[in-house]
From Swiss-Prot:
Pfam families: Cren7 (PF11520)
UniProt GO molecular function: double-stranded DNA binding
InterPro entries listed in its UniProt record: Cren7_sf (IPR038647), dsDNA-bd_Cren7 (IPR020906)
Highest taxon in the source lineage: Archaea
Protein name, per record: Chromatin protein Cren7
Similarity comment text for this entry: Belongs to the Cren7 family.
Length: 64
């Protein structure tokens, strides 16, 4: 199976405090009941190897 390469997103890495450009591992919509939701991405810090979540743009494609 071939997956499309998603474009990188500029996010702040909470483990190092630096602004980095990363491609999310997974993207999903998080929406509370009765309100408009936001898209969240799962990222892996290149320096520490820890995983973190951050908001991605609303027009970003969702993954599995």
């Amino acid at each position: 199976m071939s997956q499309k390469q998603l474009p990188p997103v500029k996010v702040r890495d909470p483990t190092t405090g630096k602004e980095v450009e990363l491609t999310p591992i997974k993207v999903w919509k998080l929406s509370p009941r009765g309100r408009r939701g936001v898209k969240i991405g799962l990222f892996k810090s290149p320096e520490t190897g820890k995983y973190f979540r951050a908001k991605v743009p609303d027009d970003y494609p969702e993954t599995g």
